[in-house]
Curated annotation (Swiss-Prot):
SMART domains, per database record: DSRM, RIBOc
Family: Belongs to the ribonuclease III family.
Domain of life: Bacteria
Record-linked HAMAP family: RNase_III
The entry's keywords: Cytoplasm, Endonuclease, Hydrolase, Magnesium, Metal-binding, mRNA processing, Nuclease, RNA-binding, rRNA processing, rRNA-binding, tRNA processing
Any coiled-coil regions, as ranges: none
Record-linked PANTHER family: RIBONUCLEASE 3, RIBONUCLEASE III
Domain DRBM, first and last residues per copy: 160-229
Positions that bind Mg(2+): 47, 120, 123
InterPro entries found in the cross-reference section: dsRBD_dom, RNase_III, RNase_III_dom, RNase_III_sf
Function: Digests double-stranded RNA. Involved in the processing of primary rRNA transcript to yield the immediate precursors to the large and small rRNAs (23S and 16S). Processes some mRNAs, and tRNAs when they are encoded in the rRNA operon. Processes pre-crRNA and tracrRNA of type II CRISPR loci if present in the organism.
Species, as recorded: Streptococcus pneumoniae (strain CGSP14)
The protein, known as: Ribonuclease 3
Compartment(s) where it occurs, according to its Swiss-Prot or TrEMBL record: Cytoplasm
């Protein structure tokens, strides 16, 4: 746990008073089950707490950020932000995947890369941070790690440009469409990706984003806005 404490201190200015609580947040049930005699606590209860505070803080942010959005739109956007896949991405950004304690079987089966385990650990960490500090510290962490991607539009793509581009290009038959990363810049928890979209090996658009998914959408948007003539 010392390496985790160093990451938290250096990247997020977080120092846990209760080190045992932090360890519990990163202990999966599979690890606790394999060490029953040691009576090790797992992170499910902390996950429950973290989920609640995350929902509250994201709801508060969206309510204040978008005063004209109806409740339905706010709920959909919140669901996109706090879904399993998104939380797993945030966990990876924070390097949390390196520190989760897994049982041997879970480790061998690829549990360290499983979105559900990573997302649960992220929520458990938020729960532990709430108990060790306060809701203000959790809010500070969320605003540092999550909100920049929200404001970059990663969870609010008005148009699915990748699908739209594919439909335009394949109207007369199948064509080979491929997206590739040109470059990655920035620290692990705040990367920026440059991506290009290629049709039959020819680059037809480029885009940038705080995730590969967002960068791909931007590249597709760039290609669509250029018009089909540039794609042939």
């Amino acid at each position: 746990m010392k390496e985790l404490q160093t990451v938290l201190k250096n990247h997020f200015a977080i120092e846990f008073t209760d080190k045992k609580l932090l360890e519990t947040a990163f202990t999966h049930t599979s690890y606790a089950n394999e060490h029953r005699l040691l009576k090790i606590s797992h992170n499910e209860r902390l996950e429950f707490l973290g989920d609640a505070v995350l929902q509250l803080l994201i709801s508060e942010y969206l309510y204040k950020k978008y005063p004209k959005k109806p409740e339905g739109d706010l709920s959909k956007l919140r669901a996109m932000i706090v879904r399993e896949e998104s939380l797993a991405g945030f966990a990876r950004d924070c390097q949390f995947d390196q520190f989760i304690k897994l049982g041997k079987g879970e480790e061998k089966s690829g549990g360290r890369n499983r979105d559900t385990i990573l997302g649960d650990a992220f929520e458990a960490f938020l729960g532990a941070l709430l108990l060790d500090k306060d809701v203000a510290k959790v809010k500070e962490f969320i605003y540092q790690v999550m909100i920049p991607k929200v404001e970059a539009g990663e969870f609010e793509m008005i148009t699915d440009y990748k699908t739209h581009l594919q439909e335009l290009l394949q109207v007369n038959g199948d064509v080979a469409i491929r997206y590739q990363v040109i470059s990655e810049t920035g620290p692990a928890h705040d990367k920026v990706f440059d991506v290009e979209v290629l049709v039959e090996g020819k680059s037809i658009g480029q885009g940038q984003g705080r995730s590969k998914k967002l960068a791909e959408q931007e590249a597709a948007k760039n290609a669509v806005e250029k018009g089909l003539d540039s794609c042939i």
